Amino acid sequence: MEDFVRQCFNPMIVELAEKAMKEYGEDPKLETNKFAAICTHLEVCFMYSDFHFIDERGESIIVESSDPNALLKHRFEIIEGRDRTMAWTVVNSICNTTGVEKPKFLPDLYDYKENRFIEVGVTRREVHIYYLEKANKIKSEKTHIHIFSFTGEEMATKEDYTLDEESRARIKTRLYTIRQEMASRGLWDSFVSPREAKRQLKKDLKSQELCAGLPTKVSHRTSPALKTLEPMWMDSNRTAALRASFLKCPKK
């Protein structure tokens, strides 16, 4: 699973996921299913924000090719992927500026058009079950919830899906592709089932012990687009650069 994650996700997403796990004392090499889940969630959050801007009239527009002369503001502020201190700093700043209620838990995004925080969920289970779990945890009508599944289903607060159909279709297609690629490598069952995941972990640990003495060679090539990518909250083209360097999963 770890190899799959490093091959199939943007290197910046992988790095952010590793930092997030280490912040909570978790090891990406051991908890590979969680590693894959965090990378998937991060990518969905970036895709959610992609192409969506607010023009000088305050109208929401979709722009797929950036015009440096256009007076555009990103419609969504990405909160997910930052360290907790920075994330809360951004949330507090938004609340002070807009007057919206401060959420109890860190949300994933802020929508400047609708003036609301958004909690994005990606589930391997039934969407309505995961939605209810999220709603029960957040306990706030102020935070909008939007859940996606790997089977193409989705559920959102008051059936308000925020994004246009095409943008949501891109996210659903990506999730379905990830599922198919996992399945083709025999990884999907363990990703869905905790019991199967534990069995696979024991098997992986045993394999590591057997291979501990073997020489290894690792490639650390960096995508050209990422060499110039600044931290995402500093660069106005953060999602465009990220999108440009998305990697497709290579077949075995």
Curated annotation (Swiss-Prot):
Entry keyword annotation includes Metal-binding: no
Residues the record marks as site: Important for efficient shutoff activity: 202-203, 206
Pfam families: Flu_PA
Domain of life: Viruses
An MF annotation (GO) of this entry: RNA binding
Cited function: Plays a major role in the shutoff of the host protein expression by cleaving mRNAs probably via an endonuclease activity. This host shutoff allows the virus to escape from the host antiviral response. Hijacks host RNA splicing machinery to selectively target host RNAs containing introns for destruction. This may explain the preferential degradation of RNAs that have undergone co- or post-transcriptional processing.
Site (Important for efficient shutoff activity and nuclear localization): 195, 198-199
Protein location: Host cytoplasm; Host nucleus
Keywords attached to this entry: Decay of host mRNAs by virus, Eukaryotic host gene expression shutoff by virus, Host cytoplasm, Host gene expression shutoff by virus, Host mRNA suppression by virus, Host nucleus, Host-virus interaction
Active-site residue numbers: 80, 108
InterPro entries attached to this UniProt entry: PA/PA-X, PA/PA-X_sf
The protein, known as: Protein PA-X
Protein family per UniProt: Belongs to the influenza viruses PA-X family.
UniProt remark on domains: The probable endonuclease active site in the N-terminus and the basic amino acid cluster in the C-terminus are important for the shutoff activity. The C-terminus acts as a nuclear localization signal. The C-terminus is recruited to host protein complexes involved in nuclear Pol II RNA processing.
Alphabetical GO biological process terms: viral RNA genome replication; viral translational frameshifting
